Amino acid sequence: MNCAASVSVIMPAAGSGQRFGSQSNKLFAHLDGKPLWQHAIDRFQHRGDVRQIVLAVSEEDESRFREQIAAISSAVPIHLVRGGATRSESVGAALEQVKRFAAESAAANASTQTLVAIHDAARPLVRQSDLDRVIAKAAETGAAILAAPVSGTLKRATGDGSETVDRRNTYVALTPQVFAIDVICQAYARDRGRMATDDAQLVERTSHPVQLVTGSADNLKITFPEDLRIAEAILNECRSEFV
């Protein structure tokens, strides 16, 4: 899998602000003067290999997203689709848009390889060097994800207390998770409705190997208010990395 790649980016954005302590979607919270979702889009929209970005949003947030998207200048088309009750349902809905785009692209250029990059819209600080490497690995193998080595000591709760877990070869999954379109579509068709912790797990169930690409720990997911303060500090310290 080493022909020219065309990347479609899917961003599930239909979540709530419950854990963030907000009455509205946390993705509308501002980081350095812009909503979180826009930072996530900015990491992708100026890349030469990205062809479209698909946001899966809730019905209640759709009009607000449309207003904010209309107010920005985007280098690639940004599509909105109605998300589902779960992350998997939202990604599945976005895949339908991606499949239509891929069919049109294949008709125009049969040599183009379509990749799908699934990225948490609440991860505003993914580095371009990490994107380069995970996209290249997915183009080569069909499935690759960013992941960070576990650095702290892991404990497993037991009936008698706890035990230490060997952290060697243990990673925390990040996003984006990047797949050849046929690989991720097969995974979703096979496991429609089944729970999974992430998209890579669905692909693993098809017996297709998923490659790990070591990514920066700066690529944190904004879940709690304190995460936003950490992201602000990272952005101020390493601004040139996130242009």
UniProtKB/Swiss-Prot annotation:
Query: Which Gene Ontology molecular function entries are recorded, alphabetically?
Result: 2-C-methyl-D-erythritol 4-phosphate cytidylyltransferase activity
Q: Which GO terms describe its biological process?
A: isopentenyl diphosphate biosynthetic process, methylerythritol 4-phosphate pathway
Task: Tell me its EC number(s), please.
Answer: 2.7.7.60
Q: Which PANTHER family match?
A: 2-C-METHYL-D-ERYTHRITOL 4-PHOSPHATE CYTIDYLYLTRANSFERASE, CHLOROPLASTIC
List the gene name: ispD
* Pfam families in alphabetical order: IspD
InterPro entries assigned:
IspD, IspD/TarI, IspD/TarI_cytidylyltransf_bact, Nucleotide-diphossugar_trans
Q: Where is this site: Transition state stabilizer?
A: 19, 26
Describe the task this protein carries out.
Answer: Catalyzes the formation of 4-diphosphocytidyl-2-C-methyl-D-erythritol from CTP and 2-C-methyl-D-erythritol 4-phosphate (MEP).
Instruction: Give the site residues for Positions MEP for the nucleophilic attack.
Output: 167, 221
- Record flagged with keyword Transferase: yes
The name this protein carries in UniProt is 2-C-methyl-D-erythritol 4-phosphate cytidylyltransferase
- The reply on keyword Disulfide bond is no
Q: Gene3D superfamilies annotated for this entry?
A: Spore Coat Polysaccharide Biosynthesis Protein SpsA, Chain A
